[in-house]
Regions:
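Short secondary-structure boundary micro-motifs
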Residues: 15, 57-59, 104
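A short secondary-structure junction motif
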Residues: 13-17, 44, 110
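Internal mixed-charge
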Residues: 1-9, 32, 39, 80-181
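Divalent metal-cofactor coordination and adjacent catalytic microenvironments
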Residues: 28-83, 122-139
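Long, hydrophobic N-terminal alpha-helical segment
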Residues: 1-31
Length: 181
């Protein structure tokens, strides 16, 4: 789903026209809301990706990763796990080796700006951004309109809670004691 389709669907949901003039009037505000929604989903679901970067002086710089890094989960070189610690600066991590390493990390998507940009989250989650945008719009309106915001928040929140069951870190999984054999 592209940014323009997110904005168009959000405008239709709140009962506004989706002509070119309306799109221009609402684009900046709804783009901010859509970017906030994509980042909220990525943070809540603890979305991960793995990218290869080069370690120099036994350190990696998380600014070399293509997306904003919330947390480094693992570092590997040639398929072997590496231990890692904080480096000598807030953006450095000691990995104890030089060369290319694969970094698995929790990320935040890049901001959308152009009409054809897509949220940097899995495609099947894109539809959740629309109720988030509508929720944010209702929350910035008059008190009568704010009362309707809860309905859109519930729709968004249910979708992200349902998605949480299949995303995230190990703390989302449970191990049950099956007893002694």
């Amino acid at each position: 789903m592209t940014l323009v389709s997110i904005i168009t669907n959000a405008l239709a949901t709140i009962g506004r026209s989706t002509d070119a003039q309306s799109m221009d009037a609402w684009k900046q505000k709804f783009t901010i809301f859509a970017n906030d929604g994509a980042k909220d989903l990525a943070h809540y679901l603890q979305l991960r990706r793995t990218d290869t970067i080069t370690a120099t002086d036994n350190q990696i710089d998380i600014n070399d990763l293509p997306f904003d890094c919330e947390k480094v989960v693992s570092v590997k070189q040639n398929g072997s796990d590496l231990s890692f610690t904080r480096g000598n600066a807030s953006n450095k991590i000691n990995v104890g080796v030089n060369g290319d390493v694969e970094v698995e990390y929790r990320y935040l998507p890049k901001d959308m700006a152009d009409d054809i940009d897509q949220p940097g989250i899995p495609e099947h989650l894109h539809h959740l951004i629309i109720p988030y945008v509508v929720f944010k719009e209702h929350m910035t309106a008059d008190p009568n309109t704010q009362r309707r915001a809860d309905m859109y928040w519930q729709d968004y929140d249910k979708g992200r809670r349902d998605a949480k069951k299949t995303y995230g870190e190990e703390d989302t999984y449970k191990i049950y004691n099956a007893g002694w054999f």
